[in-house]
């Protein structure tokens, strides 16, 4: 069931509008507010053009842009409660639609955060997340320290947000699903060389966790004519691609998902109920399944002793090669 990608919503459907936002050019503080206002116009237009949309999702970097020369300029960063978010929250309230947004956020205690915020249809913040796995060494952001939150959304959705490179680590989607998420949003700024990995991880994150994944990247050229991919994608709970976008800047790609289907599958599937079976290994032979943790990497991570066999030979261990200098120097100025 697709309901014509949300034109005729199935009962219980969550209709998504994934915006392949044009890469913005940010040169001065006023550009941030102007960009937020442009995105707010897209939010209002999407809801007006397709009133069935419940949630509009903007990609990573859609306010702050992709120019690394601006990323540690304190005047070109945002605040969680700053004017840019006020504009976007106002658009959600006016249009009566939920929204998911991205900001590069000031951090008085260190390197900036790469943050995502979900706003409901009354303009209230419902989820706040800091990217846990920055795309090192290219990105200078502080690693998120708040875990992966989950919030209630429209139509029975339990929403989680992971950002860009987060989705390349299967543990991230697994954690979101383990905490109850049945719809996992993924926002990104990826360019075309990452296209294949983007597709397979979006599908795998859905299948491995019996969750819908809804993912979108920036689109169009940056100042050097390097294009972000767009490539909005919604995957069913079995990993099947329901809807896939292209590279068109500012295209709103729509799709419907039915959160109750994910909930039901998690209860009724036998084979391939992987998120349950991870903690109940071999339950056909062992009452309740084996409940131990046989994974060395998990044990070492918990103990603070995570170390790959080739650790001493890894070439890139800080951002110096990407021009950021040693970690102690990575601060907004």
Show the residue positions of the predicted features.
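N-terminal active-site segment of His-dependent metallophosphoesterases
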Residues: 1-55, 185
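C-terminal beta-strand edge segments of enzyme domains
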Residues: 3, 150, 217-333
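A short, flexible beta-alpha/helix-coil linker loop
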Residues: 21-26, 63-64, 69, 220
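Eukaryotic scaffold repeat domains enriched in small/polar residues
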Residues: 30-35, 46-48, 94, 98, ...
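Cys-nucleophile CN-hydrolase/nitrilase-fold catalytic domain and related Cys-dependent amidase chemistry
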Residues: 33-122, 126-128, 191-209
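Short beta->alpha transition motifs characteristic of CBS
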Residues: 69-71, 117, 128-135, 233, ...
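CN hydrolase (nitrilase-like) catalytic-core segments centered on the catalytic cysteine
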Residues: 83-99, 158, 168-256
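Active-site catalytic loop in hydrolytic enzyme cores
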Residues: 107-182, 187-204, 228
């Amino acid at each position: 069931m697709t309901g014509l990608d949300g034109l005729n919503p199935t009962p219980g459907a969550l209709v998504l509008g994934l915006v392949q936002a044009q890469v913005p050019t940010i040169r001065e503080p006023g550009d941030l507010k102007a960009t937020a206002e442009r995105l707010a116009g897209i939010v209002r237009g999407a809801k007006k053009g397709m009133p069935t949309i419940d949630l509009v999702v903007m990609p990573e970097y859609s306010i702050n842009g992709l120019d690394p020369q601006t990323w540690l300029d304190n005047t070109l960063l945002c605040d969680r409660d700053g004017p840019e978010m006020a504009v976007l929250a106002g658009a959600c309230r006016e249009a009566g639609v939920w929204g998911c947004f991205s900001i590069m956020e000031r951090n008085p205690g260190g390197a900036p955060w790469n943050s995502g915020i979900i706003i409901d249809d009354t303009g209230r913040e419902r989820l706040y997340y800091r990217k846990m796995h920055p795309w090192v060494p290219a990105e200078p952001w502080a690693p998120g320290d708040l875990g992966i939150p989950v919030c209630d959304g429209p139509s029975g959705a339990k929403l989680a947000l992971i950002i860009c490179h987060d989705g390349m680590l299967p543990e991230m989607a697994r954690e979101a699903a383990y905490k109850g998420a049945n719809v996992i949003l993924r926002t990104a700024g990826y360019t075309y060389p990452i296209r294949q990995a983007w597709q397979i991880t979006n599908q795998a994150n859905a299948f491995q966790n019996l969750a819908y994944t809804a993912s979108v990247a920036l689109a169009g050229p940056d100042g050097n004519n390097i294009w972000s991919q767009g490539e909005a994608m919604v995957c069913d709970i079995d990993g099947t691609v329901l809807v896939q976008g292209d590279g068109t800047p500012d295209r709103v790609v729509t799709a419907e998902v039915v959160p109750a289907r994910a909930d039901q599958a998690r209860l009724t599937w036998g084979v391939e109920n992987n998120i349950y079976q991870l903690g109940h290994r071999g339950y056909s032979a062992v009452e309740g399944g084996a409940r131990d943790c046989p994974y060395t990497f998990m044990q070492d991570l918990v103990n603070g002793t995570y170390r790959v066999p080739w650790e001493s030979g890894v070439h890139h261990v800080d951002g110096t090669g990407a021009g950021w200098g040693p970690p102690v120097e990575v601060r907004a100025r």
